[in-house]
Regions:
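Glycan-binding loop/region signatures in secreted carbohydrate-active enzymes
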Residues: 76-159, 187-200
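Conserved active-site loop/cleft motifs that coordinate metal ions or position small ligands
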Residues: 71-73, 167-172
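Short, acidic/polar
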Residues: 5-16, 147-162
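Generic structural signal for well-ordered alpha-helices
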Residues: 13, 54-59, 158, 179-186
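Substrate-binding surface in catalytic domains of secreted glycosidases
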Residues: 1-112
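C-terminal helical cap(s) of enzyme catalytic domains, especially alpha/beta-barrels
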Residues: 36-43, 179-194
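Active-site rim elements
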Residues: 47-48, 142-149, 169-172
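A short, acidic, flexible beta-alpha connecting loop/helix-capping segment that sits on the rim
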Residues: 172-179
């Protein structure tokens, strides 16, 4: 199911809960294509016109789905934007922008591609938004903004899902060709007892 409220009235959760063991929640890729926003934010940012977050999705779904059936998600890919307006006070969220040709035409790029193409050597600085718990890269010269999950934002998500006692999935495995992100998941859930409630 999608993490945003869009199309929510199409689901009869009372009926589905009788037959579905768990729900993979697509809590990523709700970006607007004409305004910069984080790909997979854990918490909301008031300047993000999309006004969406994983935490928001969880609190929406917990009213309709048993907690032990909820599996939230992380992204092993990112989105690249060209910002089309001036930047003031380093605020890059909520700016007029468009997806650029990246690894794919829609601005989509795997995590391994981000590491090799949107790094310090290519003029990018990497930032962590402490409010939304989101990582992004930005090039002040070209005004290219890239939003994605990295080990820091992924650890924040893992702590969240452990606290809520829900599960974690990701999309997709092919984006992590050196297993950096997979290792973060393993290292930060190691020793956790596997059971139906936690799904770790």
């Amino acid at each position: 199911v999608h993490g945003t409220p869009l199309g929510d009235n199409r689901y009869d959760y009372d009926y589905l809960n009788e037959y579905i063991d768990f729900y993979n929640v697509m809590s990523y890729d709700a970006n607007l294509d004409d305004v910069t926003s984080h790909l997979c934010p854990l918490y909301k940012n008031e300047i993000d016109s999309r006004n969406y977050s994983i935490d928001e999705a969880y609190h929406k779904l917990i009213k309709k789905i048993p907690n032990e059936k909820i599996i939230l998600s992380a992204a092993f890919y990112g989105k690249a934007y060209q910002i089309d307006e001036d930047i003031e006070n380093d605020l890059v969220i909520g700016k007029k922008a468009h997806y650029i040709q990246s690894e794919y035409q829609s601005g989509t790029c795997h995590y391994f591609y981000i590491k090799s193409h949107y790094n310090k050597e290519k003029g990018f600085e990497v930032f962590f938004d402490s409010k939304t718990k989101s990582t992004y890269a930005y090039n002040y010269k070209t005004k290219v903004f890239v939003t994605y999950d990295d080990p820091i934002s992924l650890k924040a998500k893992i702590e969240y899902i452990k606290n809520k006692k829900v599960g974690l999935m990701f999309w997709d495995y092919g984006g992590d060709n050196d297993s950096e992100l997979i290792s973060v998941i393993i290292d930060n859930t190691k020793g956790e007892e596997y059971d139906k409630e936690r799904k770790i």
